[in-house]
Swiss-Prot record:
It comes from Methylobacterium nodulans (strain LMG 21967 / CNCM I-2342 / ORS 2060). This is Holliday junction branch migration complex subunit RuvA. One of its GO terms (biological process) is DNA repair. Homotetramer. Forms an RuvA(8)-RuvB(12)-Holliday junction (HJ) complex. HJ DNA is sandwiched between 2 RuvA tetramers; dsDNA enters through RuvA and exits via RuvB. An RuvB hexamer assembles on each DNA strand where it exits the tetramer. Each RuvB hexamer is contacted by two RuvA subunits (via domain III) on 2 adjacent RuvB subunits; this complex drives branch migration. In the full resolvosome a probable DNA-RuvA(4)-RuvB(12)-RuvC(2) complex forms which resolves the HJ. The gene is ruvA. Has three domains with a flexible linker between the domains II and III and assumes an 'L' shape. Domain III is highly mobile and contacts RuvB.
Length: 205
């Protein structure tokens, strides 16, 4: 099994990179996010590798970090998720953001991935929610806040602040995290306009 490759970027394809390692070209399939972060052709690169062996082929999947590779494996434990869908999810969400999305039940963020509809996004959240914190630390306050928003029990100023940030174009995950941070500074009785202002300050960092 191949666990890591270090070589020179030979060329790129739509969903893969060919890595030249001592004269041998390895075709490595990657998420769009990973491909975007690799260097230009001719420069050195290294990737953590997941090797899939079948009767008729050997396929390599490459990742910029061990965390991304672990999520690739974990995603495939859910029915309906294969390698293509797993790479699609990792193309739109960083490992830390994916952990937050699952822990907070943000199905909309996950459903943005190609090949993932609302039903599969809900299944991913349901089956992986208890496992997500083990892969990346998620603020317990953020989880509680997300649960309150989902159940419509959050204070109105909180819900209004999150909605306002989302309407400004921020993803639900980032908006919720920013308001959670704002709440810690402003206190539970803060007005929506205060939470929005402090939330925007958090997002600008």
């Amino acid at each position: 099994m191949i666990g890591k490759l270090k070589g020179v970027v030979d060329s790129y394809g739509e969903d893969f990179v060919i890595l030249d390692v001592h004269g041998v070209g390895y075709v490595v399939h990657c998420s769009a996010r990973t491909l975007q972060r690799l260097p230009p052709v001719g420069e050195a690169a290294d990737l953590a590798i997941e090797t899939h062996v079948r009767e008729d082929m050997i396929r390599l999947y490459g990742f910029r970090s061990d965390a991304e590779r672990e999520w690739f494996r974990l995603l495939q434990t859910v029915q309906g998720v294969g390698t293509r869908v797993a790479l699609g999810v990792l193309s739109v969400l960083e490992p830390a953001d994916l952990a937050t999305a699952i822990a907070t039940g943000d199905k909309g963020a996950i459903a943005r991935a190609p090949g993932v509809g609302p039903r599969l996004a809900a299944r991913l959240v349901a089956e992986l929610k208890d496992k997500a914190p083990a892969f990346a630390p998620v603020d317990p306050a953020l989880i509680r806040l997300a649960g309150a928003v989902e159940e419509r029990t959050a204070p109105q100023p909180v819900a209004d602040a999150i909605s306002a940030l989302v309407n400004l174009g921020y993803p639900q995950i980032q908006a919720s995290a920013a308001v959670a941070a704002a709440l810690q500074g402003a206190g539970e009785g803060a007005e929506a306009k205060t939470l929005i202002r402090l939330g925007l300050r958090e997002l600008a960092r």
